[in-house]
């Protein structure tokens, strides 16, 4: 088995992840790296505030690898920081997921990390991973300029975004994680936020179409919501975005089973659901305050443009 050498490595860990358990995991990771010499040299930094992981990754010049230890939020920040670096010197990304969703980790084949077993780091290979770029316009900002955000797994608008964003407070109340958390959030948000979200959409420069979207997911990987296979055929290395959207009006009594059927990818042939690949998407929202999320992080916008950046990031994944 070929042993992985990450080279000069920066470990960015969110100590608050998994209700604070990630601090202990970071300590165990440090001892593992010392014992196994998987990196020629490594530095460990604990994040101190929101946005800190992005800053650290953006400043990680000279490193061959950046390891993100935490939930989807810290991984999303690290990806956004790395994407500010020039591609020629951009470090590779490795992840150790200690969060509630972990869809990007599942896409990479890391689906059983417990915080104690670092075997996923023993034998890894590099792959070039597509990254999504979102340009968003928020009239409330007053600048008229687009904000830029990158994502590694999922972008969604509508009830599915409301479900993802709703997990933050629900996790604090219930202590749930993974699929049970997202399923409970789905049941709650279907009562609070279920409606049509009218928008105008255009894919790859085609004429714009007005749709009454219930959900709109623009994926790099196949899953969101801790394993819901919303775009079962999505491949994060094919240079394409995979889109799933469902158009209303659809009664709640029909929409809820449709949503639950996405757990196993059985929704794709249902009448309200449309599936398509694209490289570029433009969406204009007819009303303010639509729920929008990218890798679980909120976006406020009246219009967005989405592009795929093919093979933009080197990512370490376990060798299977």
Predicted segment positions?
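Short glycine-rich anion-binding loops that position phosphate/pyrophosphate groups of nucleotides
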Residues: 16-17, 71-74, 98-101, 157, ...
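Glycine-rich phosphate/pyrophosphate-binding beta-alpha loops
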Residues: 156, 160, 217-231, 298
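ATP/NTP phosphate-donor binding region
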Residues: 1-69, 76, 116
């Amino acid at each position: 088995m070929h042993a992985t050498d990450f080279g000069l490595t920066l470990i960015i860990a969110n100590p608050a992840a998994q209700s604070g358990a990630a601090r202990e995991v970071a300590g165990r990771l440090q001892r593992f790296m010392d014992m196994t010499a998987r990196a020629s040299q490594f530095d460990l930094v604990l994040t101190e505030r929101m946005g800190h992981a992005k800053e650290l990754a953006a400043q990680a010049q000279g490193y061959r690898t950046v390891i993100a230890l935490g939930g989807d939020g810290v991984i999303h920040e690290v990806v956004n920081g790395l994407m500010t670096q020039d591609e020629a010197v951009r470090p590779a990304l490795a992840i150790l997921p200690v969060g509630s969703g972990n869809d990007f980790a599942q896409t990479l084949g890391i689906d059983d990390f417990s915080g104690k077993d670092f075997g996923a780091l023993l034998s890894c290979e590099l792959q070039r991973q597509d990254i999504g770029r979102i340009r968003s316009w928020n009239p409330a900002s007053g600048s008229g300029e687009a904000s830029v955000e990158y994502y590694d797994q999922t972008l969604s608008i509508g009830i599915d975004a409301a479900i993802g964003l709703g997990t933050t407070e629900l996790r604090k109340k219930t202590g749930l994680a993974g699929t049970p958390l997202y399923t409970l959030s789905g049941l709650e948000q279907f009562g609070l936020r279920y409606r049509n979200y009218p928008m105008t959409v255009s894919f790859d420069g085609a004429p714009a179409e007005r749709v009454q979207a219930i959900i709109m997911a623009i994926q790099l990987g196949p899953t969101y919501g801790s394993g819901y296979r919303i775009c079962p055929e999505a491949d994060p290395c094919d240079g394409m975005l995979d889109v799933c959207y469902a158009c209303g009006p659809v009664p709640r009594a029909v929409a809820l089973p449709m949503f639950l059927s996405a757990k196993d990818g059985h929704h794709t042939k249902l009448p309200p659901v449309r599936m398509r690949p694209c490289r570029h998407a433009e969406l204009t929202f007819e009303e303010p305050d639509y729920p929008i999320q990218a890798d679980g992080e909120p976006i406020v916008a009246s219009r967005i443009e989405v592009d795929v950046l093919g093979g933009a990031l080197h990512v370490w994944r376990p060798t299977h």
